[in-house]
Design a protein with these regions (language model features):
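Residues that form generic nucleotide/phosphate-binding pockets
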Residues: 108, 158, 202, 206
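A short helix->loop->beta-strand "cap" motif at the edges of active sites that frequently abuts
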Residues: 44, 161-165
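Structural recognition of alpha->loop->beta junctions
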Residues: 131-150, 186-198
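Generic structural signal for residues positioned in beta-strands
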Residues: 64, 79-81, 141, 187-190, ...
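A metal-dependent hydrolase metal-coordination microenvironment
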Residues: 2-119, 128, 135-137, 145-157, ...
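C-terminal functional module detector
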Residues: 1-5, 21, 173-219
């Protein structure tokens, strides 16, 4: 954190879904406008859309736009959040994935995207295993904080086995009408400007912190 400036904070969420493919995928409730409006109202500086296996160009006129999508078709939710993607990688392992398959996917994605991030590692028991994190490499960040899961055991295992991996936090919003799942988990990035290159550099260098707000049941 030695290069951090306490005056330069960008509030960001990179993981959220909108209606795509005729409403086939989860996120069908959200329109681009709804998602943008909800996060703008909460003061977010960077509002990312990460639709399943598709780059959403709704906000591409914004100078801070970073092409992003969530990769993965498999039934065990072994997904990757791809930030700074050049294109969408269509291939994936649909059913069971062993360690070599998971590593192969990360390696292939790394050739086509700036940041290929294991998403919600603890989402299902047969997805990313805690044991996997002893060996998996070729990624710089892990989505430790996710609106559905917190994966500190996965992160701790990666760090304890010599993998320098930084944290990222996201809502993984699928329905902005449910305010209890909007603005709960996100990333504060220490960067002088809301600029794609500066944001990604800061994430790569660990100049960011994850934020987790607890839900208060009687709010």
């Amino acid at each position: 954190y030695k290069d951090m400036n306490p005056d330069n904070w960008i509030q960001a969420n990179f993981h959220a879904h909108t209606r795509q493919f005729g409403g086939l995928t989860n996120g069908r409730v959200n329109t681009n406008e709804m998602l943008d409006s909800a996060y703008s109202a909460l003061g977010f500086d960077y509002i990312g859309i990460s639709d399943y296996n598709k780059i959403n160009y709704y906000d591409s006129v914004n100078p801070s736009f970073i092409p992003t999508y969530e990769h993965g078709y498999g039934i065990f939710k072994i997904h990757q959040l791809c930030i700074g993607a050049e294109k969408v990688r269509r291939l994936d392992y649909f059913a069971f994935q062993n360690l070599s398959m998971k590593q192969h996917t990360l390696n292939r994605l790394a050739k086509q995207t700036r940041l290929a991030i294991p998403a919600h590692p603890s989402f299902v028991k047969k997805g990313y295993l805690v044991e996997d994190m002893k060996y998996l490499s070729n990624y710089k960040l892990m989505e430790v904080l996710n609106g559905f899961r917190i994966s500190t055991a996965h992160w701790d295992t990666a760090l304890s086995n010599g993998h320098l991996v930084y944290l990222i936090g996201n809502d993984d919003s699928h329905d902005v009408n449910d305010i209890t799942y909007v603005g709960r988990r996100f990333t504060m990035i220490n960067a002088p400007e809301n600029n794609p290159e500066l944001l990604m550099q800061a994430l790569e260098n660990g100049n960011a912190v994850g934020v987790d707000f607890s839900v208060i049941s009687d709010e």
